[in-house]
Design a protein with these regions (language model features):
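Active-site glycine/GP-rich loop and adjacent strand/helix microenvironment
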Residues: 1-40, 198, 223-528
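Nucleotide 5′-phosphate-binding alpha/beta core
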Residues: 1-154, 160-181, 245, 465-470, ...
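Glycine- and other small-residue-rich loops at beta-strand/loop junctions that grip anionic moieties
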Residues: 97, 102-103, 203, 228-229, ...
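Short acidic, glycine/Ser/Thr-rich loop/turn "cap" segments at secondary-structure junctions
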Residues: 135-140, 160-169, 196-203, 226-227, ...
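Catalytic micro-motifs at enzyme active sites that drive phosphoryl/nucleotidyl and oxygen chemistry
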Residues: 137-142, 204-205, 238-240, 265-268
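Short glycine-enriched loops at secondary-structure junctions
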Residues: 172, 204-208, 256
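Conserved ATP-dependent adenylate/AMP-binding module captured primarily in the ANL superfamily
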Residues: 175-198, 235-247
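Conserved AMP-binding loop of ANL adenylate-forming enzymes
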Residues: 182-221
């Protein structure tokens, strides 16, 4: 069994074979990684009286009555979502049991080389033949697999800090290999003509999957990488100059930044770019009109043959990514051995659900099949797709589901039902608006607060997002001091500098709907 499939291997397999590999990995992962080592799911299985050995495919999650896990569950139990083989039910685990679980996992998953490595060294320890060296090698192996080494952030939580998703060295290895495939998907049609990818990473340098994943993926598969980042130490005008200087043929960015900031500077300076180029977009919903705008801007400066491809991932997917195979097309899961994507619909208002048929679409739910540290099973992402097609893709030849029109549930009440929190993508950052408002109201000087998300150009649905706060202060409050405090808190929790509007309570109540107070408003005009 392979840990990940190369792009060519992925194209050579039928979906029946891919699904069989997924089910094998799912069984092994649930039985010998999740149940023994994951405190949250171990407790969940016990509470619902589910034997992990009964879970043979992701569909069994619904069959045995397990609830979907929501973002609110994770944000309230961060430590319990981290695999910990050294403890079980709060007690230290015998080291021999740790090794036995690992051997069983490798056997069930089909990892022959890894099982042989652990078995031989375990035998040396038992027979006291080269025991010291073998013990150290086992410790190094377990440390590489399980010890958290870094994190990136999901959205904010009640403590006022964003929620970290932890990764190990092992996770990083999987992530780098899987992320590179999205780039290879993008350049695949150009490869036969000798296309040389000289890429520029325009994602903001921050502890997020968007930067780490893109940066690592580009380093794996590009001929040259300009690791420049957007909105950082290098100004946009200098980034455009670097693109011309290094003959960049590939740009990776969030669509809002690329269209509204970088491309505006591009057409202003009019550098001479290469004729053929690749543009990778992620981090925000990708609208067809934005793709057309971006292509037109690049055509103005000589890049007349562009291929614009979108990617989908999230902090919690960690080690995997889905990607379009053609402009304005659907998305394929390019990491099917890392995580499985399934789609659900809700059957009642208290969490009842069922898996949907392909033509129905539904809410994206993920099941990790590999990885360490923070892990998620039956995890509701909050993103919705309109439809899913199956069979061999007529565009790229992949024989696997293709899902279309990814969108975030925008109605606040529906979000609370789906995810247990209200989140929005604002300037590419996932912002927990529910927690932000709670944090604002916890400030001693604030009496009431309303959050509004809008557009910098109200009539342009593709213009930059704006986060506005309508604030009512308590009497005798220093407004200047309060403004600094609010800006600092909001920047820390959301990475966004807000527009702050102070007003009296009567004015706010009138604007916010009177008795039916609208605490959070998404006023962004939607594309027609």
């Amino acid at each position: 069994m392979k840990r990940f499939l190369t792009f060519d291997e992925l194209k050579s397999l039928t979906y029946e074979k891919i699904e069989a590999l997924q089910n094998q990995k799912f069984r092994a992962f649930i039985r010998y990684q999740i149940y023994p080592n994951h405190p949250f799911y171990r407790r969940l299985f016990k509470e619902h009286e589910v034997d992990p050995f009964d879970l043979k495919t992701p569909a069994d999650w619904a069959k045995y009555g397990l609830p979907l896990v929501k973002k609110a569950d994770y944000k309230g139990n961060l430590r319990e979502f981290v695999l910990n083989p050294q403890q079980v039910d709060g007690q230290d685990r015998n080291p021999a049991e740790v090794i036995r679980n690992l051997l069983d996992y490798y056997k069930e998953a089909g990892y022959k080389d890894e099982r042989s490595f652990v078995f031989r060294r375990g035998l040396k320890v038992k027979l006291r033949v080269g025991k010291e060296k073998a013990t150290q090698e086992l410790l190094d192996h377990i440390k590489y697999q399980y010890s958290p080494r870094f994190f990136w952030f999901s959205s904010g939580r009640a403590s006022g800090l964003p929620s970290p998703v932890f990764l190990t060295h092992y996770d990083n290895e999987l992530m780098l290999n899987n992320m590179a495939k999205s780039g290879k998907m993008a350049i695949d049609p150009f490869v036969k003509d000798g296309f040389e990818l000289r890429a520029m990473n325009l994602f903001p340098s921050a502890p997020h999957l968007g930067f780490f994943g893109v940066d690592g993926g580009l380093l794996q598969m590009a001929d040259f990488v300009v690791r420049s980042t957007a909105g950082g130490a290098i100004s946009t005008d200098k980034l455009v100059q670097l693109a011309e200087l290094f003959k960049v043929t590939g740009f990776a960015a969030m669509p809002g930044y690329l269209r509204n900031i970088f491309c505006q500077e591009l057409v202003k300076q009019k550098p001479k770019l290469e004729k053929r180029g690749i543009i990778l977009l992620a981090g925000e919903r990708i609208y067809d009109a934005v793709v057309d705008n971006i292509k037109d801007y690049f055509a103005e400066v000589g890049m007349t043959e562009t291929r614009v491809i979108g990617g989908w991932a999230a902090s919690e997917t960690k080690i995997g990514v889905a990607c379009q195979c053609q402009e304005k097309g659907g998305y394929h899961n390019l990491s099917p051995l890392a995580f499985a994507i399934r789609f659900v619909k809700f059957t009642d208002s208290v969490g009842g659900y069922e898996f949907t048929s392909p033509e129905e679409g539904g809410y994206i739910t993920i099941f990790h099949l590999d990885g360490r540290s923070s892990m998620f099973e039956g995890y509701l992402m909050g993103d919705h797709v309109d439809r899913v097609t199956t069979g061999k893709c007529p565009h790229c030849g992949l024989d696997m589901p293709c899902f279309f029109n990814i969108s975030r549930e925008s109605e606040i009440g529906a979000q609370m039902q789906v995810m247990g929190i209200a989140e929005e993508k604002i300037k590419g950052a996932t912002v927990n608006l529910t927690v932000l408002r709670e944090s604002l109201l916890a400030l001693s000087d604030i009496h009431e607060a309303q959050i509004i998300v809008s557009k910098s150009k109200p009539d342009d649905p593709y213009s930059m997002d704006v986060l506005s706060l309508n604030i009512v202060l308590k009497s005798n409050t220093n407004q200047t001091k309060a403004q600094r405090t609010i800006q600092k808190l909001t920047k820390m929790e959301t990475e966004i500098t807000p527009e702050i509007h102070f007003m009296d309570l009567d004015t706010l109540l009138e604007q916010a709907g009177g008795l039916k107070f609208q605490e959070i408003v998404d006023a962004r005009v939607k594309p027609s």
